[in-house]
Amino acid sequence: MPIEIPTDLTPELVPLSWLIGEWEGRGRLGTGDEDSEHFLQHVSFTHNGLPYLQYRAESWLTDDDGTRLRPLTVETGFWALERKQLDADGGPGLVPADIVPALKSADEVEALRNSEGGFDISVSISHPGGISELYYGQIKGPQIQLTTDMVMRGSHSKDYSAATRIFGLVDGNLLWRWDVATGGEAGKGLEAHASAFLARVS
């Protein structure tokens, strides 16, 4: 399936452009074995002309046939190429970006390509319960690998120390896996948390 790049997309989002749209499908909690619970997920990646994608994922527990049982969770965040922020970029807060984007051409974006042939990315994701994740990783064509650099927890949040996520585009579908560590040293003891197979719906 060809990927259509929006005409108003800022150049540095082109490597992430295959994510843009809405996705929906089913997944399994844990290792995905016979006893793992099922869930339904709706994911959206949108853009507003600035150099990041807005991300939202809403999930529901389901029965084996896919009938919704009850809400599971919602997470929201931002995805962007990882680079130094320039004077032309917006922020912090309501400081506006320049009308002309910081990276104006494909050549300027190409200069960010890393030694492995991909692009470094950063992803921030917030969850209910006072937990926020900051991931760093790489996008290389239709494959994404992310590892938490930091997990921020409120004083009453549940224990959660690290995570990895992988995403891939396979035959036009979005596949992902999420592993987490809920105790001990960050990055140690990662266990399968969930995985899903999502089809593009718009």
From Swiss-Prot:
CDD domains: lipocalin_heme-bd-THAP4-like. Pfam families: THAP4_heme-bd. Its cofactor is heme b. It catalyses: peroxynitrite = nitrate. Its EC number is 5.99.-.-. GO terms for molecular function: heme binding; metal ion binding; peroxynitrite isomerase activity. Binds 1 heme b group per subunit, that coordinates a highly solvent-exposed Fe(III) atom. A motif (GXWXGXG) lies at residues 21-27. Disulfide bonds: none annotated. Keywords: Heme, Iron, Isomerase, Metal-binding. InterPro entries: Calycin, Nb(III)_bact/plant, Nitrobindin, THAP4-like_heme-bd. Pathway: Nitrogen metabolism. Heme b binds at residue 193. Belongs to the nitrobindin family. Homodimer. Heme-binding protein able to scavenge peroxynitrite and to protect free L-tyrosine against peroxynitrite-mediated nitration, by acting as a peroxynitrite isomerase that converts peroxynitrite to nitrate. Therefore, this protein likely plays a role in peroxynitrite sensing and in the detoxification of reactive nitrogen and oxygen species (RNS and ROS, respectively). Is able to bind nitric oxide (NO) in vitro, but may act as a sensor of peroxynitrite levels in vivo. This is Peroxynitrite isomerase.
